[in-house]
Amino acid sequence: MDRGKTMKLYIELVPETCWYENLRKVLSKKEWDKIRIDVYAKANHKCEICGASGKLNCHEFWEYDDKNAIQYLKGFQALCDSCHNIKHIGFVNVQISKGIWPKKVLDDLAKHFMKVNNVGLNEFNQHVKKAFDVWRERSKKKWKTDLGNFNKESTQKTLF
C-alpha cells in the first residue's frame, strides 16, 4: 500500500500471519503504558489524523518488505477510535460478523473516512478493496517481525 500519500486516513491491514506479533505483546503493561502516554502527549492528546480529542489509541504502524517477508515497526500514532478502527477495518468486520458490534459501525466509519479524506463512497469502496487485495496476498506468507529501535531491550533502556 502507498501508506496513503494522497489521503490523511487509510487502511492498514496487518497480514493474518502477523496477527498479535507486535511490541505491545513483548512489553509489560507498565512499559507499554509509558510508550502510549508519551505518544499521546507528543500529539497534544488529539488524534494525529483528524484532530479529535477524547479517548485515544496508540497505533503501531508498520512497513512491509514484500520481497523478503519482513514487517518493520516504524513508529506510533495517537488515534481516535474512528481513525484506529479504519486502520483495522478487518477487525471491525470480524466483530460485526460475530454480532459483537452492530453493522452501523461500518457505515459510521465509512462516513468518517470520507469526511477526513474529502472523498466519496466510490473512493472509499475502492480503497477498501485495494487494502483487502494487498492483505490477502501478504497473508499467504510467513512474515518475520523486526521491532527495530523499539525492541524490548532498547525500550527498557529509554523507559527506566
What are these regions (language model features)?
Residues R36, Y40, K46-A78, K87-K98:
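Histidine-centered nuclease catalytic patch
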